Amino acid sequence: MLTLDKIYHAAFVLKDVARKTDLIEAPKLSKDCQLYLKTENLQVTGSFKVRGAYYKISQLSKEESDKGVIACSAGNHAQGVALAATRRGIRSIVCMPDGAPIMKVENTKNLLSLIHI
């Protein structure tokens, strides 16, 4: 179950990985309320996916870490897993579909992940 302590722990684990991003008001999307958008597109990988990938990988045991990680994704999750694994010294393999955006494939390769298409 998700607890406030787990949220604080995740924030601590992610403090040097995830950028603090702003909330910007979205008046055109707000009707009868104030709506804000979180600018997670400004994360190092271009999306919020790095948060979940890094946190999960940070919680692996030594035995699990020694085995490496495998992920399947067309882009954002792939980059999050590759970044997290590389920063934690864990081998990663990312399976990407044929037709995945070239930019996403190249960015994932640049994060030192082995790519299978």
Model-flagged regions — what are they?
Residues 1-115:
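PLP-dependent amino-acid enzyme catalytic core
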